[in-house]
Regions:
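Bacterial N-terminal signal peptides
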Residues: 2-12
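Sec/Tat signal peptide C-region and signal peptidase I cleavage site
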Residues: 14-16
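Aromatic- and Gly/Pro-enriched helix-to-coil junctions and flexible linker segments
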Residues: 19-23, 29-117, 247-438, 558-769
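Sequence context of c-type cytochrome heme-c attachment sites
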Residues: 100-198, 620-645, 709-710, 714-716
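Residue-level detector of short, conserved catalytic/binding motifs and their immediate flanks
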Residues: 167-169, 203-206, 471, 486, ...
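Basic, glycine-/proline-tolerant helical and adjacent loop/strand elements
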Residues: 175-206, 210-243
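Exposed regions on extracellular, virion, or secretory-pathway luminal proteins
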Residues: 204, 428, 432-571, 582
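Secreted/processed peptides and extracellular or luminal domains of membrane proteins
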Residues: 211-214, 444, 462, 621-623, ...
């Protein structure tokens, strides 16, 4: 049984990460940041802060509602029964993903190669680490426009870890209906085989993925091929790695870092959506609260992320204060946000880059590479991590609104923008106008076009109907070729920057010269912080000449500008008000997780935008969800009947969750009959001795993470503080020591085993060949 451990995890701010790197060159000397649970959750007034995602509660392996995005992408109903169609090779799978993503100047996903990492698959390619590196792929691109349909929203929500040697893809993908990430494994992913898809053992996965979401490391991501030494090792293979470049810049792993950073907040935002609006989660006030949160989120996205939070914004203040009051009742000491950061690890310090195949399996260079598999305790993803931060009531409303804004794709906002603007152009909404005095200068360019510079308004507007603007327009033969408004400040004091002039014209009128402009921000219409569209800008000035405009326009020419705003956003607020008053428990504003497709369907219906085919919520046509095999509650009774000793049964009780699966990673030394298990335990005894002995050392003196790991103990209801002195641990250590003593004739010595190097100790499983 494997889990998807993206081995280079989410970084915090670059400056903080760089400081960590400066203190710990190579990452090898970095100390563990684990802190006791009581310290992590201590809050004000005697209250304990609450985990937004509790690392001790992995949740059920199979989703109780909905399915993963991966299932929706690759389910196949063309056969007699629903199944999966997963393209092979990996480049074909990637091409299928690209079909759902919007083309962009940069690839819509980021990919790195990791030959010597920290995932459970890290030993699978030994000793051919460089020939069979692990691929990590994260989707960070926007969905492709799909007329009449939502399409899948994969950005920050789909991560793949592919290991060619084992034919395994480990998957983390989002479940829209459940509001959580799912952990899956694809087996037999190789030419000629039929891939099988399983949901993974979440308890195993969340031992490292303590945020129940993807991980990535702090900069400088030295396990990836952004590290020049790693890239050089891969290049010596002289093979194609599934179309993935070997030489890459740090922008690629940084893109994965950014994606996992955003993904880490998704479960926390879902918690706020479901519970922050009040204890009566489906009551009328809670529904109205969610309606207001969604309204502000849509306003925020339509306005191009303009900041609308102001002290004099009464609607916002009412919403924020009500939500803060509910927050203080439920989470008086705040919400703890899980830490997805694991330390950077440099696997090739000082290695002479000679291809292992050129020197043989017994050569010191090959042996040195083998030793790079060692993961010190301080760098192990299994180490319990303290919270990344604590969210508190005063910031709750802004956290919820800006978080919800990220649950909508660019295509969703573009579609809504067009629909609202079309309604406004049809005369269905009120308009208001703002004006300003302008100074104009003109200059003829070498290509024959004319540049007209505009400076309108004096200083910053303070209300009323005045606005200010600085920009330029390029004209040819009376038509606007292009232009830009560098700064546009509206009467409410909000300033728009980088506004594009997308069209317009210049003509003579009875009033003089008239310049009419259409404005946009990117592919959407320009909008103010209130969400309303800027329908047009008109500038007029006296022009006594017969020509529309000439290059000798006086330098001090003065004109007058009128900015027209269409009040089209209130239609959205009205639809949300209607939804808030509805009582359907399954609708867009219920206490269920925020479901993008459900919200968009409701908006489209309410605004008369036409039917919308929803993706990734209804799962009735998908193949049955299957969970990968792992021990059940009756296994100990079966083992006792088959002759397992008491101590062997203790091994099963504490270790079977991870080590009795039918997969070799993590080592399944408890898989098989009691006789086979005894042989496995004897083969694994050296490593077991080291791992168990770590519980007797201070945390900063441990060379390896102790086993069972802390989170496994908590799941078993044991105290990490009491476990080191427990008779159960003493019995396990004695059993393993006796195995080693029966081999060597003397008591094992921890220091001697550590001196040999953990990766040179006998492996936990015999060679299957």
């Amino acid at each position: 049984m494997t889990l998807f451990a993206l081995v280079v995890a989410l970084a915090g701010p670059w400056a903080r990460a760089a400081a960590v790197e400066a203190r710990s060159p190579g990452g090898a000397g970095e100390r563990s940041t684990a802190i006791p649970a009581a310290s992590a959750t201590a809050g004000q007034g005697g209250h304990a802060a609450t985990w937004a995602v509790d690392p001790r509660q992995p949740g059920p392996d199979l989703p109780t509602v909905g399915r993963s995005l991966f299932d929706f992408l690759f389910a196949d109903d063309s056969g007699a029964a629903p199944g999966y169609r997963i393209p092979f090779p990996f480049s074909a799978l990637r091409a299928e993903l690209a079909r759902h993503l919007r083309p962009a100047p940069v690839p819509p996903f980021k990919q790195v190669l990791i030959p010597l990492g920290r995932s459970l698959q890290r030993t699978a390619a030994a000793p051919q680490f460089a020939r069979y590196p692990r691929v990590v792929l994260a989707v960070d691109g926007e969905p492709a426009p799909l007329p009449g349909a939502t399409g899948p929203f994969l950005k920050d929500r789909l991560y793949l870890g592919y290991m060619e040697k084992t034919g395994v893809i480990e998957v983390i993908s989002y479940n829209e209906a459940a509001g959580r990430f799912e952990f899956q494994i694809v087996k037999d992913y190789r030419a000629g085989d039929e891939p099988r898809v399983f949901y993974a053992n979440r308890a195993v996965c969340t031992a490292c993925h303590q945020n129940a979401a993807p991980l990535f490391s702090r900069p400088l991501w030295d396990e990836t091929n952004a590290n020049g030494r790693v890239a050089a090792l891969l290049e010596q293979e002289q093979r194609d790695f599934y179309g993935i470049p070997v030489q890459i810049g740090i922008d690629v792993p940084n893109g994965i870092d950014d994606a996992t950073d955003r993904a880490n907040q998704i479960p926390a935002i879902q918690l706020l959506w479901q519970r922050a609006c009040g204890a009566d989660a489906d009551g009328q006030e809670a529904r109205r609260c969610r309606g207001r949160a969604l309204r502000f989120a849509l306003q925020y996205r339509l306005a191009g992320h303009l900041q609308f939070v102001r002290a004099d914004h009464r609607e916002w203040q009412g919403f924020a204060e009500a939500l803060a009051g509910s927050w203080r009742q439920q989470w008086p000491a705040g919400l703890l946000i899980s830490n997805p950061d694991i330390p950077n690890r440099r696997p090739l310090p000082g290695v002479v880059l000679i291809h292992p195949g050129a020197v043989g399996a017994a050569h010191p260079v090959t042996d040195h590479l083998q030793q790079q598999l060692h993961v010190p305790s301080a760098l192990d993803p299994l180490q319990p991590r303290p919270p990344l931060e604590t969210w508190t009531a005063p910031e709750g409303a802004e956290r919820l609104v800006t978080g919800l804004a990220g649950f909508l794709a660019d295509v969703d906002v573009e579609r809504l923008d067009r629909a609202l603007y079309d309604r406004a152009r049809g005369g269905a909404v009120p308009h208001r106008q703002y004006d300003a005095s302008c100074g104009l200068t003109a200059k003829r360019r070498d290509d024959g076009s004319l540049r007209l510079s505009l400076t309108c308004g004096g200083g910053e507007p303070t209300g009323g109907t005045a606005f200010a603007m600085v920009g330029r327009v390029y004209l040819r033969d009376g038509e606007v070729v292009r232009g830009a408004i560098d700064r546009l400040t509206l009467p409410d004091g909000v300033t728009l920057i980088d506004v594009q002039v997308t069209g317009g014209s210049l003509a003579n009128t009875a009033r003089g010269a008239r310049l009419a402009l259409q404005l946009s921000r990117g592919v959407r219409h320009a909008r103010g912080a209130d969400g309303n569209a800027i329908e047009g800008l008109e500038v007029v000035w006296e022009n006594p000449r017969s020509a529309v405009i000439a290059a000798d326009l006086p330098p001090a020419t003065e004109g007058h500008a009128v900015l027209t705003v269409a009040e089209d956003f209130p239609a959205v607020a009205a639809v949300l008000d209607v939804l808030a008053e509805a009582g359907d428990a399954g609708d867009a504003l219920s206490s269920q997780p925020f479901r993008r497709a459900t919200v968009l369907e409701a908006l489209h219906t309410g605004l008369g935008m036409g039917a919308l085919q929803a993706c990734c919520v209804e799962d009735s046509g998908l193949p049955p969800a299957a969970v990968d095999e792992h021990p059940d509650d009756g296994v100990l009774r079966q083992l006792a009947a088959q002759g397992a000793t008491h101590t062997e049964q203790v091994f099963y009780h504490y270790c079977a969750l991870c080590h009795q699966t039918n997969e070799r990673s993590p080592p399944n030394f408890l898989h098989g009959t009691p006789a086979q298990v005894r042989d496995n335990l004897a083969h694994c005894a050296e490593r077991l001795y080291v791992r168990l002995a770590m519980w007797g050392l201070p945390s900063d003196a441990r060379s390896k993470t102790p086993m069972p790991p802390v989170h496994a103990l908590e799941e078993l209801g044991l105290s990490p503080a009491a476990w080191p002195e427990s008779p159960e641990l003493a019995g396990l250590r004695r059993y393993v020591a006796d195995l080693l003593q029966s081999e060597t004739g003397r008591e094992p010595v921890l220091a001697e085993l550590e001196a040999r190097g953990y990766e040179k100790l006998r492996t936990c499983l015999a060679d299957p060949g």
